[in-house]
Amino acid sequence: MSRRSTAEKETAKSDPIYRNRLVNMLVNRILRHGKKSLAYRILYRAMKNIQQKTEKNPLSVLRQAIRGVTPNVTVKARRVGGSTYQVPIEIRSTQGKALAIRWSLGASRKRPPGRNMAFKLSYELMDAARENGNAIRKKEETHRMAEANRAFAHFR
């Protein structure tokens, strides 16, 4: 038995302008090669773009987009008796939020080239808030996979 106590989970810090943890989580996922100031610049430009296009609070649009992309279930490969099954598993809200952020950023990076990342990210978030876009499609695909493999749920 381990003698160490379990480490407490660190709560995500909030960003300097919006004072929001979700924004900070998004910045940390945009981050590449340790360039955090660039990641902040990309996100803040995207938020400004959202503000101009929708004339709504960009933070509420961001929250709505992430809430729309967050999955309830996911599938996990489980090997049973020589064959691999895709087993549907319910996921916690923090893990779902992390997946939603990852999918949103992946979808915005895959948008057609020619525009900067802030532009792509803002349009992906606005699409996700309106319940369409590639990140929403990814969530629906995951839910369909989980529904199709519901018979294997007892392999958990």
Swiss-Prot record:
Q: Which UniProt keywords apply?
A: Chloroplast, Plastid, Ribonucleoprotein, Ribosomal protein, RNA-binding, rRNA-binding
Gene3D superfamilies for this protein:
Ribosomal protein S7 domain (1.10.455.10)
Q: Name one GO cellular component term.
A: chloroplast
Q: Which PROSITE patterns match?
A: RIBOSOMAL_S7
Biological process (GO), any one: translation
The task this protein performs is described as:
One of the primary rRNA binding proteins, it binds directly to 16S rRNA where it nucleates assembly of the head domain of the 30S subunit.
Superkingdom: Eukaryota
**Lineage of this protein's species?**
Eukaryota, Viridiplantae, Streptophyta, Embryophyta, Tracheophyta
A Pfam family that this protein carries is: Ribosomal_S7
A GO term for molecular function: rRNA binding
InterPro entries listed in its UniProt record: Ribosomal_uS7, Ribosomal_uS7_bac/org-type, Ribosomal_uS7_CS, Ribosomal_uS7_dom, Ribosomal_uS7_dom_sf
Q: What is this protein called?
A: Small ribosomal subunit protein uS7c
User: Does the UniProt entry include the keyword RNA-binding?
Assistant: yes
Query: Which HAMAP family did the record assign?
Result: Ribosomal_uS7_B (MF_00480_B)
Task: Tell where it localizes.
Answer: Plastid, Chloroplast
How does the annotation summarize its subunit structure? Part of the 30S ribosomal subunit.
Question: Which family, according to UniProt?
Answer: Belongs to the universal ribosomal protein uS7 family.
